Amino acid sequence: MAKVREVYQSFTDSTTKTLIQDEAYRNIRPIMEKHKLANPYAQTVEAANDLEGFGIATNPYSIELHTHAAAKTIENKLLEVLGSILPQEPVTFMFLKPRKLNYMRRNPRIKDIFHNVAIEPRDVARYPKETIIDKLTEITTETAYISDTLHFLDPSYIVETFQNCPKLQTLYATLVLPVEAAFKMESTHPNIYSLKYFGDGFQYIPGNHGGGAYHHEFAHLQWLKVGKIKWRDPKDSFLGHLNYTTEQVEMHTVTVQLQESFAANHLYCIRRGDLLTPEVRTFGQPDRYVIPPQIFLPKVHNCKKPILKKTMMQLFLYVRTVKVAKNCDIFAKVRQLIKSSDLDKYSAVELVYLVSYMEFLADLQATTCFSDTLSGGLLTKTLAPVRAWIQEKKMQLFGLEDYAKLVKAVDFHPVDFSFKVETWDFRFHPLQAWKAFRPREVSDVEEMESLFSDGDLLDCFTRMPAYAVNAEEDLATIRKTPEMDVGQEVKEPAGDRNQYSNPAETFLNKLHRKHSREVKHQAVKKAKRLAEIQESMRAEGEAEPNETSGGMGAIPSNAELPGTSDARQELTLPTTKPVPARWEDASFTDSSVEEEQVRLLGEEAVKTATQQVIEGLPWKHWIPQLNAVGFKALLIQRDRSGTMIMPITEMVSGLEKEDFPEGTPKELARELLVMNRSPATIPLDLLRARDYGSDVKNKRIGAITKTQATSWGEYLTGKIESLTERKVATCVIHGAGGSGKSHAIQKALREIGKGSDITVVLPTNELRLDWSKKVPNTEPYMFKTYEKALIGGTGSIVIFDDYSKLPPGYIEALVCFYSKIKLIILTGDSRQSVYHETAEDASIRHLGPATEYFSKYCRYYLNATHRNKKDLANMLGVYSERTGVTEISMSAEFLEGIPTLVPSDEKRKLYMGTGRNDTFTYAGCQGLTKPKVQIVLDHNTQVCSANVMYTALSRATDRIHFVNTSANSSAFWEKLDSTPYLKTFLSVVREQALREYEPAEAEPIQEPEPQTHMCVENEESVLEEYKEELLEKFDREIHSESHGHSNCVQTEDTTIQLFSHQQAKDETLLWATIDARLKTSNQEANFREFLSKKDIGDVLFLNYQKAMGLPKERIPFSQEVWEACAHEVQSKYLSKSKCNLINGTVRQSPDFDENKIMVFLKSQWVTKVEKLGLPKIKPGQTIAAFYQQTVMLFGTMARYMRWFRQAFQPKEVFINCETTPEDMSVWALNNWNFSRPSLANDYTAFDQSQDGAMLQFEVLKAKHHCIPEEIIQAYIDIKTNAQIFLGTLSIMRLTGEGPTFDANTECNIAYTHTKFDIPAGTAQVYAGDDSALDCVPEVKHSFHRLEDKLLLKSKPVITQQKKGSWPEFCGWLITPKGVMKDPIKLHVSLKLAEAKGELKKCQDSYEIDLSYAYDHKDSLHDLFDEKQCQAHTLTCRTLIKSGRGTVSLPRLRNFL
């Protein structure tokens, strides 16, 4: 399985993984459905693991609760097993609820018999009344079953049952008997049940739920051994039990065999007859236990508790390996090996016995006292057996030697859950012989007292349904409320009617008068506007008297069309009181005669003016069609070049107007006729249909269709290829985005409602949801995505919305596949983007878009929009009547809460990975309408087609915001000015502190940890395993032809040889390091890489921005903070010693090239545990020396951004910069979640892998902080043109460049959040290339597309956050007690210092590091495993013996 898992883990392609997951899910579903019957419950993780060991799966998403779910699951599983072996004929069930037959999957038509005896009061509620009998009667079936009862009975019950029921042949029975109770052990399955012992009995407690507990006598455990039961059947009752002959007795035998066993639940098969059964009966034993031999007197002082054999062997080897095994050391070792959570399972007396026993073993000699057979001559060898016999007899008389004592003392007795079966013969004993094994005699009723303890008394009562109660409450409420007749009119009070005023009538009169005034005012405005239009048209007509308007057959030139003059001319009306125009929604008019005359005169004037305008328009014949889709079309509009925009274009003549097919809803036909969209019967291109069908059959395209069976794909292609032609009535509707193509169809569908044979096919699920929302009163299955429609079928009328986004050939294939389709309606835009197939081997990739084929059947193109305002629509060449100004803005910042449009699907997935779920591609946003959108511009934008750009630009109704995420490179080739010496670029103004130190509040005094004692360990126990594999010096050293071997393995001390000593003067190591760590390039290639990684840089920055809580808008530049950071950097530099400043003179000189870098090899001892004693020395690390002013400038920049980062970063993010271990401990205790696995992250070649993508990220980050542009350009220049003696370096991180730590940390954060989908509130700690998270987040799906474009590769390490497995961060372990140094790493480093003789110099530092763990004392047993405890103990002893005799952090603080 490990090899298979390794192969599966090697798959990195996300598509392959998706296919594997889909296939696995299809296999999982029937399996989970099968196990759901027995295990429908929500289980704990530990219980689920135990159940899986029994072959019982658990659904991790189940939420059904039970007090003892695991135990109940096993009970159900045994019933399921029983159901599979029971015959399909009537069976007698005893002590069983009838509803449990469901778990057996038993046919309810079988007339099974139920015999239930009410032993306890609650049995009345447990069993249905019709199944309860006064006493057990004769069993009339061949097979019977006793449920969870047999363990309370003795074999005499079996004898009586088979004796009184001659027809009975097979009896099945389930028992609940924990095998470990025979040894008085704790439960071997504590997650399923627990045990408690009381005198001569014990309690079985399922799931620690006392309500379901059983009480057993130890005598019940005899059932575990029963193999056969025999008895006699006297023919004459006069003979009694003693006086009989063979002829007078008939022999009977039943055979008992274990059928199945899960934990404490067992299924027995008891068969009439003397049959074969295994001599040994074995029960499941998860762990191996032993009991020490009973060697002490009195017997009570021996250790009788079964102990894990592993623990016993660890203790034995410990006491035999240490020099002196003191009593306290053995106790400490026992404390170390036993988990704190398991201590309550041991009594103090048992531990004393165990330690005493181990101390006894430690004092005995392990050297044999017997002679060997190899020494001596012939005579000696001949007499050797005699001597051995004499020595053996001597020890029997005078006592054993130490060696013989040790051999007998370590002869552990295994605890074996295997028993030899026994035969119970009642032929010569009374039937009550079983009770001889019981500690006392118990009546039959007492035996059955705890038989059924998990019943629910409420099961037998009928409860009133909730809806019935609510109905009664509603009825009571209605009765309390006086009824009101809806149709009853309000009567006026008696008396003078003139004095009565109806409030509703008064209100309506006021509303009527107000509305009339508003309508009249609107009519005046419209009349004036029509007069202006008429005047402008007349003016243009006079300018061109010889020209006439062109017909609708061709688009007229600019000279032929009327202009848009600004001339104003008042329209003279008969009265100053205009009336509502006919297109206004005026519900009320004044009833006076004067106002009626005004209304008639106003209508006449408006009609006349409107008709004059229409007569001058080139599209006057298309006005009804334009009005039908909501356009008045009375204005002339022009694009940017001055060309008039026609609202109707691409007219196709010659198409016959055919009748709609029979069965077409009249509402739909009416709307299409009004828009002049009559159907035309067209032939479909079968070649396109066959190409699509071939791709589907061969699973080259699609998502859902790939999951279909091969036979379905063959049926699809077969049906398409069988057709010679296919014609269908088609309505093609083309129009601009927002022109209302779908509006009329949706209106008709709302009128039609449910019950129609119409299917709407949509290209995306988002569009499907939009249609469902706009047409809510239809069946949900009317709207389908295109693959669902192909698989699930359609109606006889199919509407394809945005059909240009459907795969080429899909429409033809669907219509050919479903012959019942008689009418298709296509809505789309030939000017917008079309479907693009990415599969290179797909046949449809070479087909043209569907709009090319169907455009010749579209009667006209509606070039008008309701979506965009007039200014934007006209720039796009589209007619619009929306007034106002479209807001256009551009910056490098993203706006929040509005959709984001990006040029590529890859970019979309990456942005969605940052939490921007409303991200669409330019092409994929088709159908989207939003008030505001933001469009991301990058290097892919320029390669997008005009159709795609039109789609993106036409999405917004009010505002478009362009986001330019690339860096400005205009000043890239400019050089930095030469800088003066150190004294000239240092500022001498007064330094300002960034923030004042505020002393922390006094913490409450915590209760001190209890003292503990760690057991003594061998000095070499930690490093010995590394020394065993140590090679010779020159086998490990690096060798080069020019400089010979390196010199990293030094001295003859094997401890020192484990550690590689890297020195700056080692030429071989220097060149090996340069070859491994540095890569050369050239300035032009570096800059090309920088530009090519723009798309990745902005994704990294967006993830970083979200992770660190930076504001969405740019952070204004603060000169005050910049100067404070500069002074801080300067002060730190001047704090160096004078010698260091003098040594840096060369880098301070103006003659030092600002792009030049001096590279050195870092001198260090390599103390990483994973690099101890490596077979081959690894290359070292480089240090880069930059021009000093460059270091200080970019150091200031890094500190400036750090200042703002610390101000905004969330509390759950901790950056280990200028902090103390105490700070990290407090943070971890308040934020870290220790209840789940964690992830620690490291990288391979972190510095060298920070390429152009990381530089893009840094530039965007600097821009967000409003760093001056000249500083950003200087940083780009130094990163792309860094020169060493070998040439120009590739873009990478160099130690010593100024912002190394901050830049590494921020790149680490950006990469981690780009790769992982980290839940909100997750505790995270970062420092350079080290990081740790308190959860194991999932890898984002979008990261797989980005992974190959990043050089950076992470090395995640998952820890379980339990004893011995804690997340590591910068050499610190994050534990529930705070942070502490990794004891193994600390000990390894200490051993190096001790071997070099430098321990005295650094002892205080080691004591401080050790004290963070040492001060937790006894709690360390819960944190460290055995190996860590060994390292901790050895470190403590080394420091205590060589120092002041103790280790304590408070004491060290006082001392230092």
Curated annotation (Swiss-Prot):
Q: Domain named RdRp catalytic: which ranges? A: 1236-1343
Q: What are the GO MF terms of this UniProt record?
A: ATP binding; ATP hydrolysis activity; mRNA methyltransferase activity; RNA binding; RNA helicase activity; RNA-directed RNA polymerase activity
Reply yes or no: does the keyword Hydrolase apply. yes
Q: Which PROSITE patterns does the record associate with it?
A: ALPHAVIRUS_MT, PSRV_HELICASE, RDRP_SSRNA_POS
Q: Name one Pfam family in it.
A: RdRP_2
Q: Which residues form a coiled coil?
A: none
Catalyzed reactions: RNA(n) + a ribonucleoside 5'-triphosphate = RNA(n+1) + diphosphate; ATP + H2O = ADP + phosphate + H(+)
Domain Alphavirus-like MT intervals: 59-224
Under Enzyme Commission nomenclature, its number is 2.7.7.48, 3.6.4.13
Q: Which residues form the (+)RNA virus helicase ATP-binding domain?
A: 695-862
Domain (+)RNA virus helicase C-terminal: from-to ranges: 863-997
- Where is the stretch described as Disordered? 536-564
**Binding-site list for ATP:** G735, A736, G737, G738, S739, G740, K741, S742
InterPro entries in the record: (+)RNA_virus_helicase_core_dom, Alphavirus-like_MT_dom, DNA/RNA_pol_sf, P-loop_NTPase, RNA-dep_RNA_pol_alsuvir, RNA-dir_pol_PSvirus
The alphabetized UniProt keywords are:
ATP-binding, Helicase, Hydrolase, Multifunctional enzyme, Nucleotide-binding, Nucleotidyltransferase, RNA-directed RNA polymerase, Transferase, Viral RNA replication
Q: Name one GO biological process term.
A: positive stranded viral RNA replication
Q: Which family does it belong to?
A: Belongs to the potexvirus/carlavirus RNA replication protein family.
Q: What does this protein do?
A: RNA replication. The central part of this protein possibly functions as an ATP-binding helicase.
Q: State what protein this is by name.
A: RNA replication protein
Organism for this UniProt entry: Potato virus X (strain X3) (PVX)
